């Protein structure tokens, strides 16, 4: 009986814990950074097509839309699953050295302050896991099976 009481008390405390996390100033800052940084443009399915009118509960869960160019075909990572695999310290270290294929602006992530990297991490973790992993990268000689945005070849010099 005592175990049931303890479990019930813990379950009642969870909403309060979640609310506290939502009020964390870094969570709020992270949400702001996601919005102004354009993260949703690629990492949230149909975000640009819907003029940004996608429920926040669907944000950053990746997309099956491919981005194809001379590098091959890339897909926006499901950040909500990706961040579940990293500690905050691992993300900060990775964010400072991140390199990725186009069109990911990895150089902008590298330019972020440590505080902003922490804020981004806490916001995405606050959203919780959702969705499924994005399709894997395809080299230039492999044809994607789904829709893609095609980038032109760069001009010859």
Protein language model regions, located:
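Flexible coil segments in periplasmic/lumen-exposed cytochrome c-class electron-transfer proteins
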Residues: 22-23, 36, 44-74, 89, ...
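Short, cysteine/histidine-rich loop/knuckle motifs that typically chelate Zn2+
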Residues: 41
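Local sequence-structure signature of Cys/Sec-based thiol-disulfide redox active-site neighborhoods
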Residues: 29-37
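A structural feature that tracks compact, well-ordered secondary-structure segments
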Residues: 80-84, 93-95, 106-108
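Hydrophobic h-region of N-terminal signal peptides that target proteins for export
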Residues: 9-18
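Sec-dependent signal peptide recognition
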Residues: 1-9
């Amino acid at each position: 009986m005592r175990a049931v009481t303890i479990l019930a008390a813990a379950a009642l405390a969870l909403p309060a814990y979640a609310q506290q996390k939502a009020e964390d100033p870094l969570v709020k800052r992270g949400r702001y950074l996601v919005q102004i940084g354009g993260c949703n443009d690629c990492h949230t399915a149909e975000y640009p097509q819907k003029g940004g009118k996608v429920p926040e509960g669907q944000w950053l869960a990746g997309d099956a839309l491919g981005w194809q160019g001379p590098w091959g075909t890339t897909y926006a990572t499901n950040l909500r699953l990706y961040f579940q695999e990293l500690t905050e310290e691992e993300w900060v270290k990775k964010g400072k050295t991140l390199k990725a294929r186009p069109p990911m602006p990895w150089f902008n992530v590298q330019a972020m302050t440590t505080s902003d990297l922490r804020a981004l991490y806490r916001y995405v973790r606050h959203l919780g896991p959702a969705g499924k992993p994005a399709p894997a990268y395809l080299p230039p000689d492999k044809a994607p099976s789904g829709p893609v945005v095609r980038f032109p070849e760069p001009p010859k010099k």
